[in-house]
Each structure stands twice: as structure tokens, then as C-alpha cells.
Amino acid sequence: MARYTGPRVRVSRRIGFNVFENRKGDKALQDRPYPPGENGRKRARETDYGTQLKEKQKVRYMYGVLEKQFRNYYKEASRMNGITGENLLILLESRLDNVIYRAGFASTRPQARQLVSHRHFKLNGKFVDVPSHQVKAGDVIEIKNASQDLIVIQHTIDTGQDYVVPSWLDVDNKKKTVKTVSYTHLRAHETTRY
């Protein structure tokens, strides 16, 4: 599936939030906390539609999903039982790249996406190289043996020791495995880390 490859800091400044979780975006928002462009400082009053659009774009860029894929997630969430917004959150949080990010094996979602694409992880003993793969409750994700000593993964695990793993994940840093327990905790809006 495709991904966004355009200017990241510009998008973060437009939205007013560092959606790509990089240091460059933090610094740019600190130095220039206004939208990019010639008329960026002259901010017009935001309408309700503008606020809703900005929040949708924030979620879309955070999870690395393009517009059509996001629309498909929304359609699927509206068909499911329950509140559509919560269902959408569950669908986005249960993506394989997001589960790896939430488990603390990657420092950002784009990094998790790349690690999945390069086949560094197994899902229930089989290689999966699709970042948007939906992880179900009870699935076990493990780092393949040849990738266990990758500097990127090791550094993220070492530096993220104080990171609180969500309760819907069971992480074993010694075996380098993750098991999804249940997504019911997500209904209570438990998101510990953007």
C-alpha cells in the first residue's frame, strides 16, 4: 500500500501537532507555531468543519493511512456493532505496525512500518510484510531470530524501559514477543502514547 512521502514538517505545522513524531517537527512547531506559507501568521477563525477536518487529518497522518484507506476503515467501523468512533480507533490500533510501535519495538510508527515491510517480524510464526495487517486478540508477534540484535530494535527497547505498555498488550522483552490480550480496554480510550 502507498504511504505519504511529502514534506512532514509542513504538515505538522499546518495541523499544529507533530504527527510524525520526529525531532524536526518538534523544533519547527516550537520556533514557528503557525501554519506554513506566505499568509501563515494571519490565521482566520476556524469553523467547526475546519476543526473536524484537522482532527481527521491528524489521525490519518499519525497512523500513516492515506485518504481512501481511511475511508475504508470508517466504512468498516460503521458496519461494526457499537460506537463508530471507538470501532475506528480499534481498527487503527490493531494494525500490525501500530501494535509493534505500542509494544515499544519501534520508536515511531513510520519506523515500525518499515520494520514490518522488511520482514523483521513474525505473526503467529509466519512472516507478514503488510503493515496494515489486522492483529486479532490472542495473536503473537515475535522478532525473527536474525533481527533480534538489530541496533535499531535493541536501542528502542533499551531506551524505552520506562515506557508504559498498554494493558491490551502482553510484552516479553527477553523473548522479544508481544501477545494481544484484548481490545476491550481500547473502548475505555486507553492510549498512553501518541
What residue spans do the PLM features occupy?
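Non-DNA-binding regulatory cores of transcription-related proteins
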Residues: 156-179, 187
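Residue-level signature of catalytic and energy-coupling elements of molecular machines
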Residues: 23, 124, 180
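Intrinsically disordered, Lys/Arg-rich N-terminal extensions and targeting peptides
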Residues: 1-64, 71-74
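S4-like RNA-binding module at protein N-termini
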Residues: 121-161
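Conserved small/polar residues in nucleotide/adenosyl-binding loops
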Residues: 184-191
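Post-transcriptional modification and biogenesis factors for structured RNAs
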Residues: 194
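A basic, amphipathic helix-loop patch mediating RNA/tRNA/ribosome contacts
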Residues: 90-137
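Ordered, amphipathic secondary-structure segments that act as subunit-interaction surfaces
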Residues: 68-99
